Amino acid sequence: MLILRQKMHAKPDKSDELMAALAEISTPARATEGVISLDIARVLTEPDSFIATAVYEDGAALERQESRPEVHKVMAILPESLAAPLERTIFDASVDPALV
């Protein structure tokens, strides 16, 4: 199982446009095979920042979700929309049976 966490700091004049594009990702992504959950939210203390957290069965599910056209749309606008580099971390949440 993989967990993806991304934080995006939008330019103030691009924040609403980015939020609208991000909103288009959630429903189709959740229907993608192998996507366990996906949530995107605005950071309450940083109104121009967004957090995306997703849980995938495996790397193939992550690749399927990231190949969706809605994701490509967001990726296309990120360079002009972000005020800081995209923060992206992928965690391996697989449990070693020897540890249980």
What are these model-predicted stretches?
Residues L2-M8, D39-E66:
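Short, well-ordered beta-strand segments in beta-rich or mixed alpha/beta enzyme
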Residues E24-I36, V55-T89:
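An amphipathic, aromatic/His-enriched active-site/gating alpha helix that lines ligand/cofactor pockets
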Residues L2, I36-D48, A76-V100:
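Glycine-rich beta-strand-turn "strand-cap" elements at beta-sheet edges
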Residues E17-A23:
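A contiguous binding-surface segment within folded domains or other stable secondary-structure elements
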Residues H9-E17:
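Short, surface-exposed ligand-recognition loops at beta-strand->loop->(often short) alpha-helix junctions
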Residues L2-L4, M19, V74:
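Anionic, Ser/Thr-rich low-complexity intrinsically disordered regions
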Residues P12-D13, A60-A61, A98:
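A short local loop/turn or secondary-structure capping micro-motif enriched for an aromatic residue
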